[in-house]
Amino acid sequence: MTVKTRSNIAKKIEKDGGPETQYLAVDPNEIIQLQEESKKIPYKMEIVWRNVALFAALHFAAAIGLYQLIFEAKWQTVIFTFLLYVFGGFGITAGAHRLWSHKSYKATTPMRIFLMILNNIALQNDVIEWARDHRCHHKWTDTDADPHNTTRGFFFAHMGWLLVRKHPQVKEQGAKLDMSDLLSDPVLVFQRKHYFPLVILCCFILPTIIPVYFWKETAFIAFYTAGTFRYCFTLHATWCINSAAHYFGWKPYDSSITPVENVFTTIAAVGEGGHNFHHTFPQDYRTSEYSLKYNWTRVLIDTAAALGLVYDRKTACDEIIGRQVSNHGCDIQRGKSIM
């Protein structure tokens, strides 16, 4: 990332008709300082073999589930598995990401409870833990304080970061982040306190019981399709944002940073693949300029807003986006991001 150019990015966003300072905006001086510190401290990745074994077992189980989904499962189970993937994805995209990590909109208590339940289906750490890592990623992108630092390679950014101990800078900088907004949310406090039983119930037990009870699917098929395969697929959809959406795509909004626009990840992660836009305007609740047919998460948020469950949706105004593209991006490439 070219820090000097990155510092010129527009940091204004619209809220209730007026601009405010962009949340999680990058501080170029802080980035330079972290990069200099990293040069002085030798670091060797330490593999966590327990995690390696668990992920290996999960992928073996997911392979069984994929076979069952294609050749053995009832059509109701196939649809149910897809719906669980979509709504579990919403628990990450609309919940942990856009609402709680970026504060890009506000939600009523019923909506926050709904998103917390969906987040349990996804099983990607409790929201407070997830949001802290994600805020580190945005504040210190591509430094050693970034949990899935892309300078360590595609595999590390994708899932390797979960197979090794966190870099000391991730822990040190993460401890400095203000997480009081999340720690004071009773919905998230409840989730953190009861996380293990909640995720076992929402991610595995209910996805197994529901097909068995309602359409007489076998427990074996239900567990491996709606449970393990769906869970593993959702993980990779999320991980592709950290990897593929930093490597393969175009940069309409800021050519100096690693995040790119990637249609595949937009589809796989229910609307999250406009990553160059998102890192340029991290508090825009839309996360991209993609149309609603690609941005399913925005559809959910807008629908909830129409029902009075969501409010204060923040967006970057067209004038600021246009100026940013003209100064640091590419108008032609922007056209590919408005589909």
Curated annotation (Swiss-Prot):
Membrane topology: Multi-pass membrane protein
GO molecular function: iron ion binding; stearoyl-CoA 9-desaturase activity
UniProt cross-references to CDD domains, sorted A to Z: Delta9-FADS-like
GO biological process: innate immune response; long-chain fatty acid biosynthetic process; post-embryonic development; unsaturated fatty acid biosynthetic process
Gene Ontology cellular-component annotations: endoplasmic reticulum membrane
Transmembrane segments: 52-72, 77-97, 195-215, 219-241
Subcellular location: Membrane
Reaction equations catalysed: octadecanoyl-CoA + 2 Fe(II)-[cytochrome b5] + O2 + 2 H(+) = (9Z)-octadecenoyl-CoA + 2 Fe(III)-[cytochrome b5] + 2 H2O; hexadecanoyl-CoA + 2 Fe(II)-[cytochrome b5] + O2 + 2 H(+) = (9Z)-hexadecenoyl-CoA + 2 Fe(III)-[cytochrome b5] + 2 H2O; heptadecanoyl-CoA + 2 Fe(II)-[cytochrome b5] + O2 + 2 H(+) = (9Z)-heptadecenoyl-CoA + 2 Fe(III)-[cytochrome b5] + 2 H2O; (11E)-octadecenoyl-CoA + 2 Fe(II)-[cytochrome b5] + O2 + 2 H(+) = (9Z,11E)-octadecadienoyl-CoA + 2 Fe(III)-[cytochrome b5] + 2 H2O
Tissues showing expression: Expressed in the intestine in adult worms and in all four larval stages. Additional expression in the hypodermis in all life stages.
UniProt-listed InterPro entries: Acyl-CoA_DS (IPR015876)
Domain notes: The histidine box domains may contain the active site and/or be involved in metal ion binding.
Additional remarks: Cytochrome b5 CYTB-5.1 is specifically required for the desaturase activity, its knockdown or mutation alters the enzyme activity.
Protein family per UniProt: Belongs to the fatty acid desaturase type 1 family.
Its job: Delta(9)-fatty acid desaturase that acts preferentially on stearoyl-CoA (octadecanoyl-CoA) producing the monounsaturated oleoyl-CoA ((9Z)-octadecenoyl-CoA), one of the most abundant monounsaturated fatty acid in Caenorhabditis elegans phospholipids and triacylglycerols. Also acts on palmitoyl-CoA (hexadecanoyl-CoA), heptadecanoyl-CoA and (11E)-octadecenoyl-CoA (trans-vaccenoyl-CoA), the monounsaturated fatty acids (MUFAs) produced are further used as substrates to synthesize polyunsaturated fatty acids (PUFAs) by several other desaturases and elongases.
Protein name in the entry: Delta(9)-fatty-acid desaturase fat-6
Encoding gene, per UniProt annotation: fat-6
